Amino acid sequence: MKQAKIIGLSTVIALSGIILVACGSKTSEQKNIQFSIPTDVASLDTTILTDQYSYDVAGNVEEGLTRVDSKGNAALALAKSIDVSKDGLTYTVTLKDNLKWSNGDKLTAKDFVYSWKRAVDPKTGSEYAYLMGAVSGANDIISGKSSLDTLGIKAESDTEFTVTLAQPTPYFKFLLSEPVYYPLDQKVVDKYGKQYGTSSDKTVYNGPFMFKSDKAWTGTNKNFSIYANPNYYDKSAVKSKQIDFQVISNANTGAQLYKQGKLDFTLLSTTDLINANKKTEGYTVFKQARTDYIEYNQSGKNASSPDAQKALANQDIRQALNLATNRAEVVKTALPGSTAATSFTPVGMSKTSTGEDFATYAKQDYSYDPTKAKELWAKGLKELGLTKLSLSLEAAGDLAPSEATANFLQTAYQQNLPGLTVNLKLVPFKQRLNDAQNGNFDMVLSGWGGDYAEPSTFLQLFTTGQSYNDGKFSSKTYDDAFKAATTTPDVLEPAKVDEHYKAAEAALYEGSYINPIDFQANPALMNPKITGLEFHSTGLAYDLKSAYIK
């Protein structure tokens, strides 16, 4: 946490750290940064991408009206100015002059109008459309109640447009840095249709970097490169001519390549690997605003069996599973560097109106109590007329921390809850995303990283009907608390906003609707010669715009 930034009437912590601030100048023979990610890029379509690893790439080749800087500010990017009305409902945006796409097309206000309407169009199916909910008309369009023309955005000229909000949103400038708010070149999207963003040659770029035909991303390959974008308005600030990405799912391989000088950045994802490399030059730990948690299928369909379906709808069963979770031991065994979760919103992301860490303020009693867990388990089974139960637990098998966590939980649950059989379902990360989104699971180990530094980036996930509410539960208490925090009149009173968000956390806990496991940290090895790389614990994790090897 670098700086607490007060925006309007809400307190937001923009968590950002600039790593090894630049000193000196680049050499004429610059070495390309070799950067690894642990799983495949799913998409470059900024309207529909959902995972952090796709964002780590897309966020460096695309850009929005704002970009979070090294001090945690929502700094102007494509926008030359953003003027806000006194009531906080109207934003007048003026774009920088002579903006261009990487293909030479002019980037204009119409590209934002098109993109935002595409995002909220139900036909697009964007899971991030809910982030557009701050804009007037968006929610009714998403739900199919209104036409696209009612969205609160209007192009006044090629370089100016106005935005009307549904409610004052103190963190709206941070939302403008999110991929779903990025512009799109309609000509290119129309050309490729549903194939847009499925490979780098079917995408166009406006950010610091771009793809070329050389070392392109085909949609499936493990090695690809991005290059400095000559049409980028701030190209003098881009310090690397080329950055090479490698998809390396085996963390041991990544560590070996780092020590051989073939990688400059790699994540360490197993306990043994972390302990073995704590004294390795370049070892560091990135604290993320991210929570790993278990979702329970409460939709009434698509569970592994009728018994599983009715069991997960039973609060005693869910509470027993929560109480049988030894979070401290999970962290010690499978997730070194992380900390046991005490709420859904993670520690270190935002502060209350009094300056207290929000997660500390909203802490719930997510404790380990195997005795009480057994009692509730027996009670739940009796209510259901069962003596034994089989549940599946799905996790990303190509991500070592997820696999290790799932293995630990399988053993712990079967030991603590008599009659329970846990069937592990370890699948590729992409499939885990799809299964969760389609409700094809009993229990799934999920993770959420904050898109901006305010509790709503976490708590809006579980409102009734929200696209990321994969368990499909509904709580009026939760919905009412979240609505009160984010709408007038209380949205304008920070202390009341804090109270309502805390009430939402309490509703999650009391209903045992989810099971928070840990607040995530990412141990990594990074070449000490890398300078100018900015790490953000929310939004774009690794901003490579000014990064290079000195």
Swiss-Prot record:
<dbReference type="InterPro" id="IPR000914">
    <property type="entry name" value="SBP_5_dom"/>
</dbReference>
<keyword id="KW-1003">Cell membrane</keyword>
<dbReference type="GO" id="GO:1904680">
    <property type="term" value="F:peptide transmembrane transporter activity"/>
</dbReference>
<dbReference type="InterPro" id="IPR023765">
    <property type="entry name" value="SBP_5_CS"/>
</dbReference>
<keyword id="KW-0564">Palmitate</keyword>
<dbReference type="GO" id="GO:0043190">
    <property type="term" value="C:ATP-binding cassette (ABC) transporter complex"/>
</dbReference>
<dbReference type="InterPro" id="IPR030678">
    <property type="entry name" value="Peptide/Ni-bd"/>
</dbReference>
<keyword id="KW-0472">Membrane</keyword>
<dbReference type="GO" id="GO:0042597">
    <property type="term" value="C:periplasmic space"/>
</dbReference>
<feature type="lipid moiety-binding region" description="N-palmitoyl cysteine">
    <location>
        <position position="23"/>
    </location>
</feature>
<feature type="lipid moiety-binding region" description="S-diacylglycerol cysteine">
    <location>
        <position position="23"/>
    </location>
</feature>
<dbReference type="GO" id="GO:0015031">
    <property type="term" value="P:protein transport"/>
</dbReference>
<dbReference type="InterPro" id="IPR039424">
    <property type="entry name" value="SBP_5"/>
</dbReference>
<feature type="signal peptide">
    <location>
        <begin position="1"/>
        <end position="22"/>
    </location>
</feature>
<dbReference type="Pfam" id="PF00496">
    <property type="entry name" value="SBP_bac_5"/>
</dbReference>
<keyword id="KW-0449">Lipoprotein</keyword>
<keyword id="KW-0732">Signal</keyword>
<keyword id="KW-0813">Transport</keyword>
<keyword id="KW-0653">Protein transport</keyword>
<keyword id="KW-0571">Peptide transport</keyword>
<protein>
    <recommendedName>
        <fullName>Dipeptide-binding protein</fullName>
    </recommendedName>
</protein>
<dbReference type="GO" id="GO:0015833">
    <property type="term" value="P:peptide transport"/>
</dbReference>
<comment type="function">
    <text>Part of the ABC transporter DppABCDF involved in dipeptide transport. Binds di- and tripeptides with high affinity. Requires a free N-terminal alpha-amino group and an alpha-peptide bound contiguous with the N-terminal amino group, has a strong selectivity for L-residues, and shows preference for dipeptides containing methionine or arginine, followed by hydrophobic tripeptides consisting of leucine or valine residues.</text>
</comment>
<comment type="similarity">
    <text>Belongs to the bacterial solute-binding protein 5 family.</text>
</comment>
<comment type="subunit">
    <text>The complex is composed of two ATP-binding proteins (DppD and DppF), two transmembrane proteins (DppB and DppC) and a solute-binding protein (DppA).</text>
</comment>
